[in-house]
């Protein structure tokens, strides 16, 4: 039960984390868990339970039946209504059990009170500063009175252009009020650095999921769901390239293809099933998601977090897309020396599926970068990086 603000007036928690933890998105919820886990190794931290106004529209079962687009959207969800409601319930249970949530739930009406209870607010990671992201709103730029330290950790702006035409002077003012700024992608760091006229150094740091090792995630993983060997296909959006790549690998390895429900409309589910892909629609919690990676014989993905968890669980994998210039994927694969795992669908027949990945070297590189990022994060929290 949420406590009233009045009962907390004299309480301060050291660090509050503000991120997309309430979305029905595996990467979003797990990066929130990973960043909380990392910070909690040295400090007291809780996730600020902020719910943007748009969330009921974005993640509710149905949208208002007031436009033709909404009607079409709702009709595609009706056949999956039980599965969608179950998935939302499983996500909420995961948050309640695995995330240390603030005792107050915030929204646009009381967001200005967030600063009353923390010495440091960490914003990020995920696409909290991507102005095109449907989840994004100005609260993630901390536009309220706050006497403590403002830190951003590996916020992603994705392909947003921070320009005079798109952004206001007020937004620049809010960004410059941060004591420490870091972005997930190098080009994003450069864009933001230019936008704030080089008034502060903008760092490029790892996604929080990569700050934790396989052992850290062990406590989250459920009992094995699929008993047979399988290829795991994971994309946030159903992709023809992903489907065809998974089918090809399935035929080569003589294994079925499984995926977990992310597309919550019947049209995309039918498209997957028509291609012989087995869609898990019941066991769809973030812990179940990790389960599919841990026990997969092979992973096919074009998702950033699909790639991240393939690396974390040391799985053979391939990133398949119509293009091979997604900076988020390129950055992480170059870091661990696996850029050759990012291919176009047209190249898959020439790809050596049996070539093993040297995870000893991969882990050395990943852990070295993670240690560096964690040290920078701790210094930012403590106030040693003000440039």
Give, region by region, the residue ranges found by the protein language model.
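Active-site anion-handling motifs in enzyme catalytic cores
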Residues: 3-387
């Amino acid at each position: 039960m949420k406590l009233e603000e009045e009962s907390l007036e004299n309480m301060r928690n050291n660090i509050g984390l503000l991120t997309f933890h309430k979305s029905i998105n595996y990467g979003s919820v797990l990066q929130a868990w990973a960043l909380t886990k990392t910070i909690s190794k040295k400090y007291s931290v809780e996730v600020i339970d902020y719910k943007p106004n748009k969330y009921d529209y974005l993640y509710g079962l149905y949208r208002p039946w007031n436009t033709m687009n909404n009607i079409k959207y709702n009709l595609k969800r009706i056949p999956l209504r039980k599965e969608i409601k179950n998935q939302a319930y499983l996500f909420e249970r995961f948050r309640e059990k695995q995330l240390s949530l603030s005792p107050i739930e915030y929204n646009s009406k009381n967001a200005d009170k967030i600063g009353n209870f923390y010495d440091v607010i960490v914003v990020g990671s995920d696409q909290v500063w991507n102005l095109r992201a449907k989840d994004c709103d100005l609260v993630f730029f901390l536009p309220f009175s706050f006497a403590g330290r403002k830190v951003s950790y590996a916020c992603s702006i994705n392909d947003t252009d921070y320009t005079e035409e798109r952004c206001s002077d007020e937004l620049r003012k809010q960004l410059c009020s941060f004591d420490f700024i870091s972005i997930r992608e190098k080009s994003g760091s450069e864009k933001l650095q230019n936008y704030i006229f080089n008034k502060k150094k903008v760092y490029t740091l790892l996604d929080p999921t990569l700050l934790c090792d396989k052992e850290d995630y062990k406590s989250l993983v459920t009992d094995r769901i699929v008993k047979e060997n399988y290829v795991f296909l994971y994309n946030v959006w159903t992709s023809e390239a992903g489907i065809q790549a998974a089918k090809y690998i399935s035929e080569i390895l003589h294994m079925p293809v499984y995926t977990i429900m992310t597309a919550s409309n019947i049209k995309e589910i039918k498209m997957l099933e028509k291609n012989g892909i087995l869609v898990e629609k019941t066991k769809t919690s973030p812990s179940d998601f990790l389960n599919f990676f841990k026990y997969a014989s092979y992973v096919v993905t074009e998702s950033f977090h699909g790639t991240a968890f393939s690396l974390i669980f040391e799985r053979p994998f391939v990133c398949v897309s119509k293009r091979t210039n997604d900076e988020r994927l390129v950055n992480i694969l170059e870091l661990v020396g696996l850029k050759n795992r990012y291919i176009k669908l047209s190249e898959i027949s020439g790809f050596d599926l049996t070539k093993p990945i040297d995870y000893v070297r991969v882990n050395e590189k990943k852990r070295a970068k993670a240690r560096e990022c964690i040290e920078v994060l701790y210094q930012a929290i403590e106030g040693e990086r003000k440039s």
